[in-house]
């Protein structure tokens, strides 16, 4: 079979092209937008399917150098660390802290359930992490970023499993959030249905006012944390006796730098600029990672994956109904938060916002939910998820 090898520059061009293709397809196919499927996922999977067809027919297989993919992944997770502002968390109120605690509990449960199912079916429990919080609460970005660590730990095809599971989560997170919230609202008589559609929040695009100088400051902070973080990752690995993901040190250094800047008021932190850079790095590295998926590796894991993902769906439904809704107050805001929790707990914050938008159009807005969900799902959640996943990989590898 002919092997077509792309160097890192070709791979970068491929990632950009697949991202552009994904943007076109998500605009042309409304069903993709409806389920909040990100453009890098769409474009990358298109190439992965094309490559799988070439492989299955014995025509050729396309491989590429993933050096820049790793660099962009580290940059992205470093920007995640910059979002963790402890003063902001303390000021955000009881609801945010309570939901963050519930989210951490869900991260642990998702990994226990996923690993348990895989172990019962005679597969490596590491594949259970791929079907657990890596894919569910983590979403496609975390799946593509952490998947290679599963491969390195011995779970061959871990990236492919994680991304496939994340795609499943995106769809079911969108399908379940609204109906479950409606069930809670109707059953508990929380609010009457609106006579007509009166709410028109736009949840698809986030707009920032950014400045060139702040971009420079933000990029310098990013480079510094990525460099120092590499040393921290090596030190942590040597001290703890098991391998940490390459990005974990950079993320921890970013947390420290962010909170030192906030505490001593050294400068106005360039949050908008760093968030924009994070979105850019995520889009390119995700497109590259998904383009490199070897979908033929899913064949032997199809049945265990189906069982594990079904268990994750059941876990989310039960936890949302019996824990999230009661703990958050059993009122309309709690029902709306439950819809959002299902969205980011099985996919991404964009799913959460889309779920809440659908509910609010029918029953009216919930300002509390629109504040709490982005704070937890968009700011703090990724950090705790990455830290717990790193521990679990070290434990199971």
Across the structure, where does each feature detected by a protein language model lie?
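Hydrophobic transmembrane alpha-helices of secondary-active transporters
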Residues: 18, 45-52, 65-93, 251-261, ...
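Juxtamembrane and boundary regions of transmembrane helices in multi-pass small-molecule transporters
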Residues: 116-123, 166-202, 314, 322-332, ...
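Flexible hinge motifs at transmembrane-helix junctions and intramembrane kinks/re-entrant loops
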Residues: 25-41, 53, 58, 62, ...
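Entry/N-cap segments of selected transmembrane alpha helices
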Residues: 71, 85-115, 167, 276, ...
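Alpha-helical membrane segments and immediately flanking helix-loop junctions
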Residues: 117-157, 161, 168, 180, ...
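Structural signature of hydrophobic alpha-helical transmembrane segments
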Residues: 3-17, 63-76, 126-133, 241-253, ...
């Amino acid at each position: 079979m002919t092997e077509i090898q792309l160097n890192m520059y070709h791979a970068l061009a491929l990632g950009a092209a697949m991202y552009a293709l994904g943007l076109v397809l998500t605009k042309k196919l409304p069903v993709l937008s409806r389920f909040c499927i990100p453009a890098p996922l769409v474009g990358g999977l298109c190439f992965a399917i094309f490559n799988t067809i070439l492989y299955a027919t014995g025509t050729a297989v396309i491989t590429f150098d993933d050096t820049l993919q790793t660099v962009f992944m580290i940059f992205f997770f470093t920007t995640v660390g910059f979002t963790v502002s402890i003063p902001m968390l303390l000021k955000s109120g009881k609801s945010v802290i309570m939901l963050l605690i519930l989210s951490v509990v869900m991260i642990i449960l998702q990994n226990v359930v996923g690993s348990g199912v895989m172990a019962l079916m005679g597969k490596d429990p590491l594949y259970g992490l791929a079907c657990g919080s890596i894919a569910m609460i983590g979403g496609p970005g975390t799946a593509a970023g952490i998947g290679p660590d599963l491969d390195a730990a011995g779970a061959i095809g871990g990236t492919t499993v994680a991304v496939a599971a994340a795609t499943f989560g995106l769809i079911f997170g969108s399908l379940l959030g609204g109906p479950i919230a409606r069930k809670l609202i109707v059953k508990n008589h929380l609010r009457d249905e609106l006579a007509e559609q009166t709410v028109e929040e736009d949840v698809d695009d986030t707009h920032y006012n950014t400045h060139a100088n702040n971009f420079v400051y933000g990029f310098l902070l990013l480079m510094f944390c990525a460099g120092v973080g590499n040393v921290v990752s090596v030190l942590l690995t040597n001290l703890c006796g098991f391998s940490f993901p390459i990005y974990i040190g950079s993320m921890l250094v970013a947390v420290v730098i962010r909170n030192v800047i906030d505490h001593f008021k050294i400068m106005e932190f360039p949050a908008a600029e760093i968030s924009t850079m994070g979105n850019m790095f995520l889009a390119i590295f995700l497109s590259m990672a998904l383009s490199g998926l070897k979908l033929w590796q899913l064949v032997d894991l199809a049945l265990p994956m189906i069982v594990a993902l079904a268990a994750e769906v059941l876990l989310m439904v039960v936890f949302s109904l019996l824990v999230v809704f009661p703990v958050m107050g059993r009122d309309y805001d709690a029902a709306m938060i439950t819809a959002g929790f299902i969205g980011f707990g099985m996919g991404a914050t964009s799913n959460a916002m889309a779920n809440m938008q659908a509910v609010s159009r029918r029953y009216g807005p919930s300002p509390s939910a629109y504040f709490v969900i982005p704070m937890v799902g968009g700011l703090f959640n990724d950090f705790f998820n990455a830290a717990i996943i790193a521990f679990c990989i070290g434990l199971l590898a």
